[in-house]
Design a protein with these regions (language model features):
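Acidic, S/T/G-rich, low-cysteine, solvent-exposed domains in lumenal/extracellular/periplasmic regions
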Residues: 1-229
Length: 229
């Protein structure tokens, strides 16, 4: 919600450390208990206002694949190298950075990708970069197309992409006008229940600029944390 993004925005501007995990197609959410009654799961996540203010480009409608890092998967009709499941080994990780220097193998499943925004003044460091054999497909295709078709339809491009990165600098607020107003309630019952609740006052004054240089760690996949993979 905008108010949650605002809270994160102000937390970062006050020097708070943040690790952000996003995903255009979170498979872990497909088996979430919240979806056991047949609700359509929300598989994509995004923080557009915040990412823009942090100088990062990310498209939650696109999944990245990389033929160089393709993982062997069993499709039910045989084993194939599937570029949307990417295995990154030691040589693919930034060995100079303390966060990735001790890592050996990471599996990113149908991840998104980050790159530095064109007019960004922040410092963007890719900790896991994709190769020139990488490309993008629409995330919705993963629900309807078999792996072999997805692999064929992925169009390779040589643009710089990262699935794990750090953006650092003196950030500006994504909310220059201050805290967003509360969103309208979905039901009259919720609205009536909230009438008795006073607006929670802000604990701090609003900041439009960071008080000091800060850095944010970004991941474009959440499934790598799941025991399922």
């Amino acid at each position: 919600s905008p108010r949650l993004q605002y809270a994160l925005d102000q937390y970062v501007l006050r020097g708070g450390r943040l690790v952000v995990l996003l995903d255009p197609n979170a498979r872990a959410d497909m088996i979430s208990p919240e979806n056991q009654f047949g609700q359509q799961p929300q598989l994509a996540s995004d923080l557009p206002e915040l990412l823009n203010s942090w100088g990062v480009d990310y498209d939650s409608t696109k999944v990245v694949g990389d033929r160089l890092h393709a993982t062997q998967v069993n499709t039910g009709q045989g084993v194939m190298s599937f570029p949307m499941w990417m295995t990154f080994r030691t040589q693919s990780l930034d060995q100079e950075h303390p966060i990735t220097a001790q890592l050996e193998n990471l599996l990113f499943v149908e991840a998104g990708s980050f790159k530095k925004a064109a007019e960004s003044k922040t410092d963007f460091t890719a900790l896991i970069s994709l190769s020139e054999q990488s490309g993008l497909i629409d995330a919705f295709q993963l629900r309807f197309s078999p792996p072999d078709q997805l692999s064929r339809e992925m169009k390779v491009d040589d643009s710089a992409k990262a699935v794990m990165a750090i953006t650092a600098g003196n950030f500006s607020s994504a909310f220059p006008n201050g805290q967003p107003a509360k969103e309208k309630k979905e039901t009259q019952a919720k609205a009536a229940a909230d009438e008795s609740e006073a607006e929670t006052p802000l604990m701090h004054t609003h900041l439009n600029e960071s008080t000091e240089r800060n850095s944010i760690l970004l991941f474009s996949d959440v499934d790598f944390l799941s025991d399922q993979f």
